[in-house]
From Swiss-Prot:
Membrane topology: Peripheral membrane protein
Region listing for Phosphoinositide-binding, in residue ranges: 1390-1408
UniProt organism field: Mus musculus (Mouse)
Residues modified as Phosphoserine: S233, S237, S449, S1020, S1387, S1417, S1677, S1692, S1719, S1822, S1839
Keywords tagged on the record: Cell membrane, Cell projection, Cilium biogenesis/degradation, Coiled coil, Cytoplasm, Cytoplasmic vesicle, Cytoskeleton, Guanine-nucleotide releasing factor, Membrane, Neurogenesis, Phosphoprotein
Gene Ontology BP annotations: cell migration; cytoskeleton-dependent intracellular transport; lamellipodium assembly; maintenance of protein location in plasma membrane; membrane organization; nervous system development; positive regulation of cilium assembly; positive regulation of epidermal growth factor receptor signaling pathway
Coiled coil: 196-425, 458-1232, 1268-1385
S-S bonds: none
Domain topic, free-text comment: The GBA (G-alpha binding and activating) motif mediates binding to the alpha subunits of guanine nucleotide-binding proteins (G proteins). In the presence of tyrosine-autophosphorylated growth factor receptors, the C-terminus folds into an SH2-like region which promotes the stable recruitment of CCDC88A to the growth factor receptors. The SH2-like region is phosphorylated by the growth factor receptors prior to completion of folding.
InterPro entries: CH_dom, CH_dom_sf, HOOK_N
Expression (tissue specificity): Expressed in the dentate gyrus, pyramidal cell layer of hippocampal regions CA1 and CA3 at postnatal 15. Expressed highly in neurons. Weakly in neuron progenitors (at protein level). Expressed in the dentate granule cell layer of the hippocampus. Expressed highly in the adult testis, moderately in the brain and at a low level in the spleen, lungs and fat.
Function of the protein: Bifunctional modulator of guanine nucleotide-binding proteins (G proteins). Acts as a non-receptor guanine nucleotide exchange factor which binds to and activates guanine nucleotide-binding protein G(i) alpha subunits. Also acts as a guanine nucleotide dissociation inhibitor for guanine nucleotide-binding protein G(s) subunit alpha GNAS. Essential for cell migration. Interacts in complex with G(i) alpha subunits with the EGFR receptor, retaining EGFR at the cell membrane following ligand stimulation and promoting EGFR signaling which triggers cell migration.
Protein name per Swiss-Prot or TrEMBL: Girdin
Length: 1873
């Protein structure tokens, strides 16, 4: 079955054009292979790879498997190599991207015998065709394609267009390199790019989905067992199962992960508990060992005490010594404290020194910065002045431009007036000329003269240009208004908002940091106070326990170290918290930056849409069609207008910049005022500082007073240290014990201790003095730093006050942030308290970890879903699904939806009514336009402006309506998106709150468990002194639990409120979605209505066209128009009101959208802050863990110490019993001691006061130090910001300088363009002057034609005699030519380039000699007969004028059109006016034709030069060959100039030149570059000969030999001005030929029309036919006297057939021989035959040319060269030639032909040029039938010099021939007289 289906497909495929094209590369299958074999060969890829190698031989050859044997893998390998090569070739060499889907190799490899396989092979072949057509060998492949059938050719051409031109298949990347592309070209490219992007994205999504499905299938194969078919449910699809299983697996995975985490947490907790238990066990064991040892020691001590009671006295003496040692120890301790103070002081001094150095460097940097700023200020002032001057100059230039425009308008008016006058004059002249030419019998209708036509053309051009100028001025004004309103405002607002937001963020960051640092400082101060109190208590305990002093000292040192560690840890915590907050702030900044970027992107999108709308409006506006003749000029004017528009835009930009600078200056002034206010506030601060200084001085005075009091109380200060220690350190009981002990000791020791304490007080006083001095110094430093900070704060406050404008928007956000921060701070405090007391808070943290990770995963998923939702919102598919689900859930919202639907229905009706109104307005406007057109064709110009204004208003209304609709839709879409986002965020937030609730509940449960455990422990442990403490802790825990409960209740309330908000948002979302759907339905309905209304509009337009014919009266139309205008005005007002209401609605929606965006941003910030706080809490939790462990260790140590102290307490109680007995003894001494104690109390009070003041001073110094550090950090941050701002300022300055440079460049360009415009206007004036001179020449030529009437018959007889002489000379010339051929070496046609170049060099040398001798022989020209005086006499001045007319033709290509039109008019004059029937009329026509032919002669010669110049220009590769070709071209033209200068051959020469110019049209088409380069290159080389050519022609028209010589010299003098003039004629002739060839009627038909009008012409033509028939019998021998026209044509046909048969290997000699034999056949005949011969030869060449082009591409230029050969051959029949010189000329032409044929740059000619040349041969017979009677004798201007061998013979022959000619001409003149 498959074979039966595939065989017809295979036959169709193998007969397809692509396969037939591929077969041109070679046979697909060996031998007579079937279609299947050929198809298999194609599919295997071996043959196609070979084809690709032929196309791209440079490609890297990869190994292709030639023996596939139906192996799919090998086939795929081969085809993949092919596809890679094709792709590489397109991308690298052709610079194109393949946009069509590449051929599927898998389908071709695995299933080639199918429809899909054939289609993929077709794609492959298509891509191969594209490569072949665009490769280097494309000419060969195109020739092969042209050899195919016509149908296949057409199909292949269509395929080529698909590959090359269709941008959907292949995208061209070369436009990227093009810099200057118009917007019209860029728009389709952008549209294509967008469509391609969409397609690529769709394909990418499809492929990604398929990849996911495949991977899932693979995973299912790996993991799932092969399920039986019964297990599968019949209803459920496998795709649904996959998705369900996937979801199920993901849920299970998440649960498993959560379980793993929980298990890990439990494991870690249990390990920690294990470790704690181990530590406790070890501690218990250590304590047991210690207690055992103490017990043993106590037992041994008891025994020893009993033994050593007698040694107590000795021990008491030792105790006395110990007391002394302790006193010494205390002194040393105090000194140790002093050492530590000194160390701290040294470090402080070092830090102060470093700070001073840093401040010094910073001040120096600031100095440099201020200097740079001052310099920059000067520069900015200068630049400001310069800009003002520039602005003034620009205003002056604008005024000047306006004046110039007004002057130009006035000049245009004057030119129009002058043009009208010239038109009237030309009409008058034409009328006079026609009256002269007319006879009295027939007076036909007058025809338009040349001047009239020129004037009409110029007037039409001027009118069109005026219209365009008006339209351009309107567009310029519109652009100004739009650019001023839109561009400036949007750009300024964006920049200001960005800068304000950035600076606001910085200010907020700095403020937050300052607040945080202040808080940390306060915490540190509180901690330091607590530590000081603890230190005091510890010192008291040390002094009470002097016996265990050594142990206590060690313990205190350890405690001090531990406290230092705690302080450092607290500081680290504060720093870490500060850093975390900084990071949070940075994250918030990043989020804000991203939101700003998003808003900027949205704004750019809106601007882009605006631009697109503007472009569409412009495209709709540009409906006018421009004329083909004026396209070039209009484009030029368009460019000028664009340049002017650029200038205008640049000026606008500069004006806007100036405005912005002025605004900035005003803002800076305002800021300066604000800064002055801030300076006043800082001055107040300085006053406060001064007050502080005064307080310090007062403190100094108090210290001095204290010193005096200390000196007065020296005697009583001996006992001060004991009481001080007792008052500070001990409780009441300990103080009494201490007093007893000290009373027991000697009073002498007390005095010593008092002395020691006195010394300590002295040292403390000195220290206080030093501290005060340091504080004074620091205050001075701080003052200096404050001044610096004030300066910097001024700079910072400038930026702050700039940001205050933008900070108003962010105040709401700040308030919310502060509230959130307060909440977070409360939460942090609660968490810290919980973490200090509870170990089980780890679970909470870890649960939070899991929840956070899950939330992050969910957030990532939700973000992805958001992106997909944003993409799919345009399609509204998911929104519909959501709507259905939400409708099921919420049926209550149906009522609200119905209300909304009603409102939407009303809105829809309003919209429909508005649309109907607008359509009515359109219909009315169209009616108005039709009626206005019908009213009067004469009043079109008057009403044109009104119509244009109405159209513009109508378009504006339409555009406004469309824009409002689009904007409303966009706003609603954005609202929906924002609400959806807000909903999602609220859901996320609710989930987070739920998770937090769960965690709090878990914590609550854990706390309850712990409380229960603690209660159990308390009940089990026996009651001791610690019970009170545990009770307190449990009470605190219960309080905290109550707090947590309150917090939970608050959180639940918040949750409930958030859920309510969520429900409200859901309802809002549903409403908006319903509105959106309704709006979509409305839009679709409106679109349908617009389509139907457009159709109705078209029908109405047709009806209007019919009704316009019926409308007759103007009065009824005017009344209807007035009524309609009134209606339109009413409608317009209503539309404007509606538009205002719509705009208000749009603004409300915008405000709503902004509020939603703000809410969204707030929620994002909250989420990120919570995440960051969570991270910081985790880190803090870790640190708290470590701290908790340390505290446990310390707690154990303290417990040990406590036990020791209890033991000591027991010992002390024993001692107290002993002391009580001793106290009774000491009561007497105590009475004496009380007096001392009272004094001591006074001193203690004073000492306490001093200590208090000292502590206050210390606190103040610490506060100042912290403030100083804070200020330092602020200073550093501000300096960093300052450096960054300076860098930004430098960047902006550089950008400003670059913009300045660009503006100056653009100004220079504008000036240059204005100069060019002036030059062009001058050239236009010059061309008008030239046209006037041509008109004058036309008059003179017509007058000369009238004078030449009488000489016609005389010259006819002279020509007959001349022909007889030429017949005799023919045989002599043939013999001489044959003699020359003996010495001539045959040259190969090609492949012997070196031999040709050698011959060329020889010929160039000989040519120089020929030129020298030729100049000598110019003086030997014989005189003409007296009867030919005044015939065709052109004055010398006129010839110069004609040359000057064309002098500027190549300088400005724009004037060619006018030139062409004028020359066409000149050429058609004789044919338009040849209508008289009598002989007199016939003669007049002949005179006109002769005069016009003489006028055209100069242009014909210029065309010859043009061909040479183009040929020379087309060979740019080699300089030497180019020079040789130029010289050869000059030689060829010199021969034509010499040999065709006679009056006899003037007509023939004209015909030949015309044919030659027709041949050159093909080269003009091929190489258009030659036009511009001809004046610079080709004309210089040929400067000498064309001038002599023209002068020779003028000399033949004169009677005297002297006159001819005089004019030759004049032509030679005017070499520099003339060469460029010849090129101008070429275009006029070409234009004429192209018009004739393009028209349907041939020139022969035209001639027939002319002959119908004139019977004389019919009679003449019949006579010529009879004479040809009569002369057929005599055409056998070459010596026969008369040759008929038919015989000559047959001979020319034979010559063409011979040239067609000649191959590329023929010698050039044979061709020259054949052409010379033909020329010898017609030289002896009469004049008309010679003319036709020249025509037939020149007309033959295109055919030959075409034939040679098909065989070899190297011989593409044979056509024009053979025309030159024809010139030289026809000139061989003149009476006075030297034959050897003629043969040399033949050699030169042949060599030049070879050199030109070898040009590799030649390309194919156009078909139009070939056809026109073929028609040109038949067209000119009509002119030369009139010239058959011309019998004027020829005059030889130049005789070519002889060679070295036969110079004397040739000179004698020349002289004899000239003498015989002169004598014959004189005898005939006598006879005629």
């Amino acid at each position: 079955m498959e074979n039966e289906i595939f065989t017809p497909l295979l036959e169709q495929f193998m007969t397809s054009p692509l396969v037939t094209w591929v077969k041109t590369f070679g046979p697909l299958a060996a031998g007579n292979g079937t279609n299947l074999d050929e198809y298999v060969a194609l599919v295997d890829g071996v043959f196609l790879n070979q084809v690709m190698l032929q196309i791209n031989p440079k490609s890297e050859s990869q190994r292709v498997n030639k023996k596939v044997n139906n192996d799919a893998s090998l086939r795929i390998h081969n085809l993949s190599i092919l596809v890679k090569q094709i792709k590489f070739y397109y991308q690298e060499t052709l610079q194109q991207l393949i946009m069509m889907p590449l051929p599927d190799i898998l389908i071709i490899g695995k299933n080639p015998f199918s429809e899909q396989g054939t289609e993929e092979v077709k794609k492959l072949l298509l891509l191969l065709l594209g490569c072949a057509v665009q490769c280097q060998k494309k000419e060969e492949f195109i020739e092969k394609i042209q050899g195919l059938d016509f149908d296949t050719k057409a199909a292949v051409a269509a395929h080529i267009q698909e590959v090359t031109h269709n941008q959907e298949n292949v995208f061209d990347l070369q436009w990227m390199e093009v810099t200057d592309m118009s917007q019209e070209d860029i728009e389709p490219l952008l549209k294509n790019m967008v469509s391609h992007l969409r397609r690529l994205i769709d394909e990418r999504d499809e492929h990604s989905e398929t990849i996911v499905e495949l991977s899932e299938e693979r995973d299912g194969v790996h993991f799932l067992p092969h399920a039986s078919s019964s297990a599968q449910s019949p209803c459920g699809s496998p795709g649904m199962k996959r998705t369900e299983s996937r979801q199920h697996l993901s849920v299970e995975l998440a649960d498993a992960k959560a379980k793993i985490r929980r298990l890990r947490q439990e494991l870690e907790e249990k390990t920690e508990q294990l470790l704690d238990c181990k530590q406790e066990l070890e501690q218990i064991e250590v304590e047991l060992k210690r207690l055992q040892q103490e017990n043993m020691n106590l037992l041994s001590d008891a025994r020893s005490a009993r033994m050593y009671r007698d040694e107590l006295d000795a021990l008491r003496e030792k105790a006395v010594r110990v007391d002394k040692l302790e006193s010494e120890l205390s002194r040393y301790k105090e000194r140790l404290h002093d050492i530590e103070f000194y160390k701290a002081r040294v470090e402080e001094l070092k830090e102060d020194n470093q700070v001073l150095l840093e401040t010094k460097t910073m001040l120096e940097d600031q100095l440099e910065g201020t200097r740079a700023r001052s310099d920059k200020l000067h520069e900015l002032e200068k630049e400001n002045l310069q800009l003002k001057a520039k602005l003034h100059d620009m205003e002056m230039e604008r005024d000047m431009d306006r004046k110039k425009i007004e002057e130009l308008m006035e000049e245009n008016m004057t030119l129009e007036m002058a043009q009208k006058q010239s038109m009237d004059e030309s009409l008058h002249l034409g009328w006079e000329l026609e009256q002269i030419s007319r006879t009295s019998e027939l007076a036909e209708a007058p025809q338009k003269s040349l001047g009239h036509e020129v004037n009409e053309l110029t007037s039409s051009k001027l009118l069109k240009l005026e219209m365009e100028n008006q339209s351009l001025t309107k567009t310029v004004e519109e652009l100004r208004s739009t650019a001023d309103s839109a561009a400036g405002s949007t750009s300024k607002i964006l920049k200001v908002e960005k800068e304000n937001q950035r600076l606001n963020k910085k200010v907020e960051i700095l403020e937050n940091e300052i607040i945080q640092e202040k808080q940390s400082l306060q915490n540190c101060q509180n901690l330091s106070k607590d530590l000081m109190k603890e230190k005091a208590q510890l010192e008291k305990t040390i002094e009470t326990l002097r016996e265990n002093s050594e142990r206590q000292i060690k313990i205190l040192e350890q405690e001090n170290e531990h406290l230092n560690q705690t302080v450092s840890s607290l500081r680290q915590r504060s720093q870490i918290s500060a850093e975390a907050r900084v990071k949070d702030i940075e994250k918030e900044n990043k989020i804000l930056h991203e939101s700003i970027k998003e808003t900027c992107g949205k704004l750019s999108k809106i601007e882009f849409e605006k631009r697109q709308m503007k472009k569409e409006l412009e495209l709709y506006k540009e409906k006018g069609e421009r004329a083909e003749e004026l396209e070039n000029e209009l484009n030029h004017l368009g460019k000028e207008n664009e340049l002017l528009q650029k200038k205008i835009t640049n000026l606008k930009i500069t004006c806007e910049k100036l405005e912005t600078l002025e605004q900035e200056n005003s803002e800076l002034e305002r800021e300066n005022r604000k800064f002055k206010k801030t300076l006043d506030s800082f001055k107040n601060l300085t006053f406060q500082l001064e007050s502080l200084e005064k307080e310090n001085s007062q403190l100094d005075e108090e210290n001095l007073e204290l010193r005096r009091s200390v000196e007065s109380l020296k005697c009583a200060s001996m006992r001060m240290a004991q009481l001080q220690l007792e008052n500070k350190e001990l409780e009441s009981e300990k103080e009494q014990l201490r007093k007893g002990l000290e009373l027991m000791r000697a009073s002498f020791k007390k005095t010593e201790r008092l002395e020691v304490s006195y010394q300590g007080l002295d040292t403390e006083n000195q220290r206080l003095q030093k501290a005060l001095e340091n504080s004074n110094k620091k205050i001075q430093q701080l003052e200096s730093e404050l001044q610096d900070l004030e300066m910097e704060n001024q700079t910072l406050q400038k930026s702050l006050e700039e940001l205050k404008i933008s900070s108003k928007r962010l105040e709401q956000l700040e308030k919310e942030n502060k509230s959130l921060e307060q909440e977070t701070s409360q939460l942090e405090k609660d968490k810290k308290q919980l973490e200090k007391e509870n170990k089980r808070l780890r679970q909470q943290a870890e649960i939070k970890d899991t929840t956070l990770e899950e939330n992050n995963v969910k957030i990532g998923n939700l973000e992805k879903e958001n992106k997909t939702l944003f993409k799919e919102i345009n399609v509204y598919k998911e929104s519909c699904v959501r709507l259905k689900e939400l409708e099921k859930e919420n049926k209550e919202l149906v009522k609200r939806a119905t209300i909304d639907i009603k409102t939407l229905v009303t809105l829809r009706e309003d919209l429909v009514s508005e649309k109907l109104k607008t359509q009515q307005m359109n219909n009315d406007l169209e009616k108005l336009t039709h009626e206005l057109e019908k009213i009067g064709l004469n009043k079109e110009r008057l009403l044109h402006d009104e119509q244009s204004t109405d159209d513009s208003r109508y378009k504006l209304l339409e555009s406004k309506l469309e824009s409002t609709l689009k904007k409303s839709l966009e706003i609603k879409e954005e609202k929906i998106a924002a609400l959806e986002a807000r909903l999602e965020e609220s859901t996320n937030y609710n989930q987070q709150l739920r998770h937090e609730l769960k965690t709090v509940k878990k914590n609550y449960e854990a706390l309850k468990q712990r409380q229960d455990e603690e209660r159990m422990v308390q009940s089990s442990i026996p009651v001791s002194g610690e019970d009170d403490k545990w009770g307190r802790e449990s009470q605190e825990a219960t309080r905290e639990l109550l707090k947590v409960k309150d917090r939970l209740i608050e959180v639940e309330r918040n949750n409930a409120t958030l859920q309510a908000e969520k429900q409200a948002l859901k309802t809002q979302l549903k409403q908006l979605e319903t509105q959106n759907n309704n709006l979509q339905a409305q839009i679709l309905a409106l679109q349908r209505q617009t389509v139907s209304l457009q159709e109705q509009n078209t029908t109405l337009q047709t009806q209007n066209a019919k009704l316009q014919v019926e409308n007759s009266t103007l009065n009824s139309q005017s009344t209807s128009l007035m009524n309609q205008n009134a209606q339109l005005l009413i409608q317009q007002s209503s539309l404007e009101n509606e538009n205002e209401s719509i705009m208000k609605e749009r603004e409300d929606l915008k405000s709503l959208y902004d509020a939603l965006i703000k809410d969204h941003e707030k929620l994002e910030l909250l989420h990120e802050r919570q995440a960051s706080e969570y991270e910081s809490l985790i880190s803090k939790h870790g640190t708290l863990k470590s701290a908790h462990k340390n505290l446990e260790v310390e707690h154990k140590d303290l417990e040990d110490r406590y036990n020791q102290l209890l033991k000591q307490k027991g010992q002390l109680e024993d001692l107290e019993k002993m002391i009580k007995t001793e106290q009774e003894k000491m009561l007497l001494e105590s009475k004496n001691h009380e007096v001392v104690a009272s004094e001591y109390k006074k001193l203690c009070g004073e000492n306490d006061r001093l200590n208090y003041t000292y502590s206050q001073l210390l606190k103040e110094t610490e506060i100042l130090q912290m403030d100083h550090k804070n200020l330092k950090s602020v200073l550093n941050n501000s300096k960093l910001e300052q450096t960054r701002l300076e860098a930004e300022f430098s960047k902006l300055k550089e950008q400003y300088q670059q913009l300045d440079i660009t503006s100056t460049k653009l100004n220079n360009q504008c000036e240059l363009l204005s100069q060019l415009k002036g030059n062009l206007e001058e050239e236009n004036r010059h061309l008008l002057d030239q046209i006037q001179t041509l008109m004058l020449q036309n008059r003179t030529l017509l007058e000369q034609n009238m004078e030449s009437k009488d000489l016609f018959h005389v010259e006819q007889r002279q020509y007959i005699d001349k022909l007889n002489e030429l017949r005799r000379q023919k045989e002599k010339l043939e013999e001489k030519i044959m003699d020359q051929y003996k010495f001539y070496d045959p040259s190969p046609p090609r492949r012997r380039g070196n031999w040709i170049t050698l011959k060329m060099r020889k010929l160039i040398k000989s040519k120089k000699d020929i030129n020298r001798e030729r100049q000598k022989s110019l003086t030997l020209t014989p005189t003409r007969s007296d009867s030919s005086e005044g015939f065709l006499q052109l004055p010398h001045q006129d010839s110069q004028d004609s040359s000057s007319v064309g002098s500027n033709s190549l300088e400005d290509g724009q004037t060619l059109g006018t030139k062409k039109s004028s020359m066409v008019a000149l050429k058609r004059l004789p044919f338009l006016r040849n209508r008289p029937k009598d002989k007199d009329k016939m003669k007049a026509c002949y005179r006109r034709s002769m005069s016009m032919n003489d006028l055209v002669q100069s242009m014909v010669l210029a065309g010859g030069q043009w061909t040479g110049s183009t040929e020379n220009l087309e060979v740019p590769d080699d300089i030497s060959t180019g020079k040789r070709r130029k010289e050869l071209g000059a030689m060829a033209f010199s021969t034509t100039a010499i040999n065709f200068s006679t009056v006899n051959s003037s007509a023939a020469f004209r015909s030949k030149q015309l044919v030659n110019n027709k041949d050159t049209t093909s080269f003009e088409d091929i190489s258009p570059q030659g036009i511009s380069d001809d004046s610079s290159t080709g004309s210089r080389v040929h400067a000498s000969r064309p001038a002599s050519l023209d002068s020779g022609r003028t000399s033949t028209s004169n009677s005297n030999n002297n006159a001819s010589l005089h004019e030759v010299k004049a032509g030679a003098v005017n070499i520099q001005s003339r060469p460029q003039s010849h090129s101008s004629g070429d275009f006029s002739l070409l234009h004429d030929h192209e018009t004739w060839s393009s028209s349907g009627s041939s020139p022969i038909q035209y001639l027939k029309r002319q002959t119908r009008s004139s019977p004389m012409l019919q009679h003449k033509i019949s006579e010529t036919i009879e004479s040809r028939a009569h002369h057929k019998m005599k055409a056998g021998s070459p010596g026969s006297e008369v040759v008929t026209l038919q015989q000559f044509l047959e001979e020319s046909n034979k010559l063409t057939s011979i040239q067609l048969k000649s191959s590329s290997q023929e010698n050039l000699l044979d061709e020259v021989m054949k052409s010379l034999s033909v020329s010898s056949d017609f030289l002896g005949k009469d004049k008309p035959v010679s003319c036709t011969l020249a025509r037939s030869v020149s007309g033959k060449t295109p055919g030959d040319f075409y034939d040679r082009r098909t065989t070899k591409p190297e011989f593409l230029r044979t056509g024009p060269q053979k025309t030159e050969d024809a010139y030289t051959i026809s000139s061989a029949g003149k009476p006075t030639p030297s034959t050897q010189g003629k043969i040399k000329l033949v050699k030169e032409t042949s060599v030049s032909r070879q050199s030109k044929d070898s040009n590799p740059y030649a390309t194919l000619p156009r078909a139009s040029s070939v056809i026109s040349t073929a028609e040109g041969t038949t067209r000119r017979t009509s002119i030369h039938d009139f010239l058959s009677k011309d019998s004027r004798l020829p005059v030889s201007v130049d005789s070519s010099p002889p060679t070295a061998g036969s110079s004397s013979t040739t000179a004698s022959n020349v002289n004899k021939v000239q003498e015989s000619r002169n004598s014959k001409s004189r005898s005939r003149e006598q006879q005629s007289s």
